[in-house]
């Protein structure tokens, strides 16, 4: 999550079966411990020696290649394995996120954090995304638990297929959803926003959550956005349903098309989003892709999964040029082609570009 960061930051030790078939404990090592490990004269020692020599020899180049984003799952995390400043060599940084390609993880030790039981949401409706970079920076100053978003297409689909939410909510749940959306429906009569921002806060008390929401709302007033406070998890449910279920609804309603996740996990540093998002939408429109844009705004991580009739040669012909245009756009802003979903067959050919 935005508040806690990536799993990799909470892994303290692993047990891993490497290519020799033996299980090894993997954890951060000090420089003396690393030297001792490399001197063992066995498979494990040779592994550490080769990897250390590799990252030390190319240290500056590896550090310079790190994408300018808070999320990235392209390639291997070589830049976090060896830190000259601290003298720590941490092989867990390489194993986490490698998806079993370097070894089989059999045991994981994690650092835990206490939960905060109360949660609330501030929803912002942006008709003009020009000040988006400033808004994002202002929101991040308040250290929210999560910072999500979805676009006007997602909102439109949610409203269009609203009765179908009964499948997930039941009749009574659907009725409550419809009632809760009445104020939002009246607000939407004044115009559909280009982007809906969802800023979530957690706290030890309900009062703490409400104070955080109110403080952020006051700071965002100069941007002239319509805003809605949903101080409890129950009140904020309607927006989470739209954010999470609209694509599933679209997929279930369009019977002759299939999901095509080829530009589904891109990341761009949030300050660039006001320039990036309009250019991205132009590419989507150019290739006539039926797609919504939703994602993790605080990290600039977006999930775009078009519905396409892949068996149609004309549709299939769109895949490569559309992907290359989107990828080039992402890399123009020094982003990543995958924040969460790793490389796979689709993105592996583009690792070298990163």
Residue positions per predicted region:
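FAD-binding subdomain of flavoenzyme oxidoreductases
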Residues: 1-141, 148
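C-terminal substrate-recognition/cap domain of FAD-linked oxidoreductases
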Residues: 85-86, 92-321, 327-329, 333-336, ...
């Amino acid at each position: 999550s935005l508040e806690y960061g990536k799993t990799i930051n909470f892994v303290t030790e692993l047990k891993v079966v490497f290519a020799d078939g033996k299980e090894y404990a993997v954890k951060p090592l000090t420089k003396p411990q690393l030297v001792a490990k490399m001197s063992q004269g066995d498979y494990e020692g040779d592994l550490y020696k080769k990897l250390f020599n590799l990252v030390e020899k190319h240290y500056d180049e590896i550090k310079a290649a790190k994408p300018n984003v808070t999320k990235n799952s392209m390639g291997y995390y070589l830049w976090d394995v060896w830190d000259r400043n601290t003298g720590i060599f941490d092989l867990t940084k390489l194993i986490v996120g490698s998806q079993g390609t370097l070894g089989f993880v059999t045991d994981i030790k994690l650092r835990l954090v206490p939960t905060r039981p109360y949660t609330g949401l501030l929803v912002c409706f942006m008709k003009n995304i020009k000040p988006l970079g400033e808004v994002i920076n202002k929101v991040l100053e308040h250290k929210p638990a999560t910072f999500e978003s979805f676009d006007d297409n997602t909102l439109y689909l949610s409203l269009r297929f609203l009765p179908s939410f009964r499948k997930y909510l039941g009749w009574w749940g659907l009725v409550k959803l419809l009632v809760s959306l009445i104020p939002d429906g009246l607000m939407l009569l004044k115009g559909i926003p280009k982007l809906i921002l969802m800023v979530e806060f957690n706290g030890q008390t309900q009062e703490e959550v409400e104070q955080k929401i109110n403080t952020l709302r006051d700071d965002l007033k100069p941007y002239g956005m319509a805003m809605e406070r949903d101080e409890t998890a129950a009140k904020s449910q309607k927006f989470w349903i739209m954010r999470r279920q609209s694509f599933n609804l679209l997929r279930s309603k369009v019977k002759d098309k299939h999901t095509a996740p080829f530009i589904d996990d891109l990341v761009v540093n949030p300050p660039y989003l006001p320039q990036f998002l309009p250019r991205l939408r132009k590419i989507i429109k150019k290739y006539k892709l039926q797609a919504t844009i939703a994602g993790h705004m605080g990290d600039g991580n977006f999930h775009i999964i078009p519905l396409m009739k892949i068996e149609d040669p004309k549709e299939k012909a769109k895949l490569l040029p559309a992907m290359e245009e989107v990828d080039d756009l992402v890399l123009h802003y020094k982003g990543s082609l995958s924040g969460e979903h790793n490389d796979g067959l689709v993105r592996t050919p583009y690792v070298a570009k990163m």
